[in-house]
Amino acid sequence: MNKQYSYPLDLSWSTEELASVLSFFNDVEAAYEGKVEAKKLLDSYKGFKAVVPSKSEEKRLGREFETVSGYSLYRAVQAAKEKGEGKISLGK
């Protein structure tokens, strides 16, 4: 996958909000490119949802992120919820 892509971000977000969203995107990338603790991904998802509470906005950002990265926010969160504890890996 192309490592040179831009994250779908809203420039009206505060620095803290940007950090929360980027942390979640980074954890999703880690799940696809290696392994990440399920709890860590779910915790960063909670931070993401504090910034993006709207389901439609979450879906829009998820589509944009998947288009540029090939990584699904939805699949990563579902895998983390199913696993509960331990590490998840969605890579090949």
UniProtKB/Swiss-Prot annotation:
InterPro entries (UniProt xref):
BH2638-like_sf (IPR023324), UPF0223 (IPR007920)
Per the record, a Pfam family? UPF0223
Please indicate which superkingdom the organism of origin belongs to. Bacteria
Q: Which family does it belong to?
A: Belongs to the UPF0223 family.
The record's section on HAMAP family has: UPF0223
User: What is this protein's record name?
Assistant: UPF0223 protein SP_1404
* Organism of provenance: Streptococcus pneumoniae serotype 4 (strain ATCC BAA-334 / TIGR4)
Q: What is the lineage of its organism?
A: Bacteria, Bacillati, Bacillota, Bacilli, Lactobacillales
